[in-house]
Amino acid sequence: MLTRMKTASLQGVNGYPVTVETDLHRGMPGFQIVGLADTTIKEAFNRIRPAIINSGYSFPREKVTVNLSPAGKPKEGSHFDLPIALGILLLTLGEEAQTEDTAFFGELSLDGRINPIRGALPLALCARKAGVHNIVLPLQNCEEAAVLEDVNIIPVSDLTQAICCVKDPQTTVPYKKKKRVEEAHSDLDFSEVIGQEYGKRALMIAAAGDHGILMMGGPGCGKTMMARRIPSILPRLSYEEQLELTGIYSVAGMLPEDEPVITSRPFRSPHHSISMAGLIGGGQKPRPGELSLAHRGVLFLDELGEFEGRAIDAMRQPVEDGFIRLNRNLEEIIFPSEVMVVAAANPCKCGNLWDEKKTCTCSSAQISSHMRKLTGPFADRIDMHVRVAQVAGKDLKEQEQENKGMTSAQMREKVVEARRIQEERYRGMPHRENGWLGESDIIRYCLPDQDGQELLRQAYEKMGLTMRAYWKICKIARTIADLEGKETIGTPEVAEALQFRIMEKEMRRNGA
């Protein structure tokens, strides 16, 4: 006797289809699971047997063999409890059921209740891609998965309810979403930032082209305040991006109960003591790190020079590629990491190096050591470098007169329009923002006109720029032109873009 139940297993933040085959045959009573199951799945017998008995059913006296197909791929997760238990019950009761169009996920407690699971949305997505139209999930996970279209999400609270769904599918009622998916309102607005018009302009350019940006300035000048307001000017998440982000947070076990669908772009600000695994992801059972949790949003690295060197170096490739590739137990796991990196740092240990009103107490050796940390390979990959000064007295006076400059709503309008232009230009390409272009695409789309190229050539020689910096200036100039609605990149756009690499030369000189 044999039953087959459809389910799925996670591989990173994605799933792949799994068929649970359950067989009863004569022999010594026993329970065996084959198919590269992890410890959690192998322990399933100790949950399934009491759950079946405490639900009023009898556990078979025959030998039970469970095969997880495909047998050659590693599998993990307690959500296999439900399909295994249902397969055993169908064989014990002698029932025949049509389960080809249904996938099952759920962890069993000893009394037969079905507990919530991690990764419900990516598992349900996998089932939908496999052609399944009915997905049975724990009740607590249904709000998360109900965002999916073209499938029926069927909630179950206990094993008895689940077996009824299998025996008599006509009686099941699909889950109806309770909450309307809307973007969470942000109380942070750029109009609250006094002065710093240069910094706000730089952040708007960075947001428009998805460029990384490094802000340097003394303590209290507003670096963190401005960084925390960046999500308020980024475009709203699309439906596909919401699914992608919700899946990442679901796998990480960080999906808020009151917000089962991620509707706002994430802002992650890890402490500088974070480990390499915490930053890029990993572990014995790989989980997304801060880079992936900030996917499609902002990763803010405050006090960049204080982060562990190994952790920062490990970010170089993922930040450029937009994904993290890990290898565990002969298995390749990929986590997404398309983030806007925003870093902040003081120019020296005391923070007063560039302050005209305060005296720097650092020695030349301390300044050089600090600057070397900020001019390494990772910082070189950040497109824009911005010097943030202390707020001037005249800016305070303008604030009193309610001359607050642009609001986040006004800045977002410009950013959204610039992103729209880029999306049309790069239609059919892997990335849709200027910040992600490679050299060949930069040559095709981002070279300035003749006068602009001459200015850029002169700057390249006088400023001692690297070729990487040269290409980054072209990308920034392209974004500035998009913000201004210009098709051609001219001298004004190149001149403004050059401002965002001037600080690099000063940093290298101080670090020499």
Residue ranges and their predicted role:
Residues 111, 301-308, 351:
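Catalytic P-loop NTPase motifs of RecA-like helicase/translocase cores
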Residues 18-24, 279, 383-390:
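Short beta-strand elements
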Residues 214-256, 321:
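Walker A/P-loop
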Residues 37-45, 60, 67-77, 286, ...:
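Basic, amphipathic alpha-helical bundle interface domains used for macromolecular binding and assembly
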Residues 1-214, 221-224, 262, 327, ...:
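Peripheral, non-AAA+ core regions of ATP-driven protein-machinery
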Residues 296, 302-303, 314:
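Walker B catalytic acidic pair
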Residues 167-205, 209, 236-291:
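P-loop NTPase nucleotide-binding/switch module
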